[in-house]
């Protein structure tokens, strides 16, 4: 099986813990469900991600060095 | 901590600004090149910072509309129909407007699917070994291997395999008989007939003598894939310059991203494909988003429209991948799933949307732009979203 995370097109995905998540949500004044989504079956998801978790994605940005985005894991 | 050769003071001055890393680096290299002093460096950094802060998007700016216009206008200058050639030798790739439409419509399969296959180091530098991978990818059918003839008198299909081709396409096997045997087995398992094989000659026929069955067998024989991946009709091998020397890169007509990644010798970290759905399936939404941006940008660049800012394309890709899957722009995708009835009706198939909304008793909150334009209210963007109120006390 190919290791998906090794591919150049796949940025780093990691599960965000409760405290960090709280900080992010208050910073942007949003609810968890307002975040962009990612499917539970997504190949790039870390193994320990479950529905309802939020993953932090660190992209190599075209406009700055790195862009951090968050996606909510959904069914 | 910069790689540039500037004094600590200058570094402190530049680091003090709100600029992103990339701009800071550019400021450093300019300062280094011109050899300016600390005071001038401070002024440069401040000026760049002011300009940077000025060019940021203001709150309530209609970024979506601006993106739509910025992609739409150059779109009018694109060729309506281009086939043939896309910077890649001899491979037909859909380009221009048709390709752009295909991308934003998120078609299940592109008109001309293709892959760019990079190879692992040992394969990428050696032409022989690169060819090994080529034959693992390109679909080999019987017509490429030898001549077929039908012997009507004995009701037999006769295949005369070409030895040179066999050796070329099975570079790891040296014995043509062994290869012919493998081919005969493939035929048996696919067509359910028993074959007779002697050297590079293979013959077989229908169970009951029947002219129709005989022709049927020949038809089916042509479809069998003996080696390689069914979808891939052709592979072109090209030598390309890289940062450290040269390497062979394969371009394929047809695509099967998942299969190719598993093939030995293929570099699974750089190989790409122009079908965003295949990328999505194998690598996830984030990779699909990247590919969308790359493909749209390349399509525009190919037509000399590279002055479209990537940010617009990034916005489009963000919206298309927002739900965790790939959604198309348009009636069946983003525009069709808007909350507002009026916004949907304004886009396409007006009557259907209004009728359905009436039947289901939908309510329009008049939150968006389109709805408010329709009812003649100010839109909630820019100054339209700001309310002024007169104070009640005097002082």
From Swiss-Prot, chain B:
- Cystine connections: none
What is a single molecular function from GO for this protein?
DNA-directed RNA polymerase activity
- According to its UniProt record, this protein's enzyme class is transferase
Where does it reside? Cytoplasm
GO biological process terms held by the UniProt record? DNA-templated transcription
Q: Which UniProt keywords apply?
A: Cytoplasm, DNA-binding, DNA-directed RNA polymerase, Nucleotidyltransferase, Transcription, Transferase
Q: Give the CDD domains listed for this entry.
A: RNAP_A (cd06528)
Functionally, this protein is described as follows: DNA-dependent RNA polymerase (RNAP) catalyzes the transcription of DNA into RNA using the four ribonucleoside triphosphates as substrates. Forms part of the jaw domain.
| Catalysed reaction equations from the record | RNA(n) + a ribonucleoside 5'-triphosphate = RNA(n+1) + diphosphate
Q: Tell me, what's a Pfam family for it?
A: RNA_pol_Rpb1_5
Q: Which family does it belong to?
A: Belongs to the RNA polymerase beta' chain family.
Main location group: cytoplasm
Q: What is its EC number?
A: 2.7.7.6
Report the transmembrane regions from the record.
none
Tell me the protein's name: DNA-directed RNA polymerase subunit Rpo1C
